[in-house]
Design a protein with these regions (language model features):
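FAD-binding beta-loop-beta segment adjacent to the flavin cofactor pocket
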Residues: 136-167
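Rossmann-like NAD(P)H-binding beta-loop-alpha module
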Residues: 59-80
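Short hydrophobic core segments
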Residues: 12-23, 155
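Conserved FAD/dinucleotide-binding core of flavoprotein oxidoreductases
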Residues: 76-135, 174, 193, 197-201, ...
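Single conserved hydrophobic/aromatic residue that forms the stacking wall/gate
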Residues: 1-7, 11
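Flavin (primarily FAD) binding-site architecture
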Residues: 19-35
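Central beta-strand plus flanking loop segment that forms part of the substrate or channel wall
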Residues: 33-65
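Active-site-proximal substrate-binding core of FAD-dependent oxidoreductases
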Residues: 163-169, 181, 185-228
Length: 237
């Protein structure tokens, strides 16, 4: 692997290399292409998520409250939604995620997030408050249909380098950790008992992680029919 990826500048000497670069990992993408790991898989999909932490007025704070929304300010054909978590110490975690497969070339994800905060239900929460931190990151949204083969000679992909994010829940930390645990178990068997690294994928398909991603497999694709039909189908499914 080191000859194909980094040439003579760096020599990686180990039995198994675990790639955990996160969404759009540079080496992970090269490995997927080189070893054709995404053969017969759907193209990977991506989104962008914005998050702000606000310190708000005590009267507007309800510790433990969780809110999720879909739709506005996006139109019915653009995938996206928000999250609002009322944390401790009068803090609110406020965020918005937009799928990067939107069709309108004039759409600005950042500006849509700012518009979202003008909604009366959101404005009343943060009014009089203070934004204390902010950030943005890419999200991997393809789900299990886009998940590549996660093993190859001498290497494994874990977490968002493979694409284990649970998109409907916008949660990927627990899935990344579980994939890392499964990778460690497979590597141990590979070293101790000479088991093939394909064991990693076998363990994955027997785990709660696979079940969780499988259950969420139709949520993102269903929104290709628009917001209303997507919500109805997701509820039925």
């Amino acid at each position: 692997i080191e000859e194909r990826l980094v040439g003579s500048e760096m020599c990686i000497r180990d039995r198994v290399t675990v790639f955990a670069e996160g969404c759009r990992g540079h080496l992970g993408k090269q490995l997927i292409k080189k070893f054709n790991l995404n053969k017969d898989k759907d193209p990977q999909q991506y989104g962008i998520g914005f998050k702000e932490i606000w310190e708000i007025d005590e009267k507007n704070h309800e510790e433990g409250l969780v809110m999720h929304t879909a739709g506005w300010p996006l139109d019915n054909n653009t995938y996206g939604g928000s999250f609002i978590y009322h944390a401790e110490n009068k803090q609110v975690f406020l965020g918005y995620v937009i799928g990067l497969d939107y069709q309108n070339p004039h759409l600005s994800p950042f500006d849509e997030f700012q518009r979202f905060k003008t909604h009366p239900s959101i404005k009343k929460i943060i009014e009089g408050g203070k934004r204390i931190s902010y950030g943005a990151r890419a999200l991997i949204e393809g789900g299990i249909q886009s998940l590549p083969k996660m093993f190859m000679p001498g290497a494994l992909l874990i977490g968002c380098d493979a694409g284990t994010l649970n998109m409907p829940k916008i949660k990927g930390s627990h899935t990344a950790m579980k994939s890392g645990i499964l990778a460690a178990e497979a590597i141990n068997e590979h070293i101790q008992s000479k088991k093939d690294l394909s064991l990693y994928e076998e363990l994955f398909k027997k785990s709660w992680l696979y079940k969780e991603l499988y259950q969420a497999r139709n949520v993102k694709p269903s929104f290709n029919w628009g917001l209303i039909l997507g919500i109805i189908f997701t509820g039925i499914d």
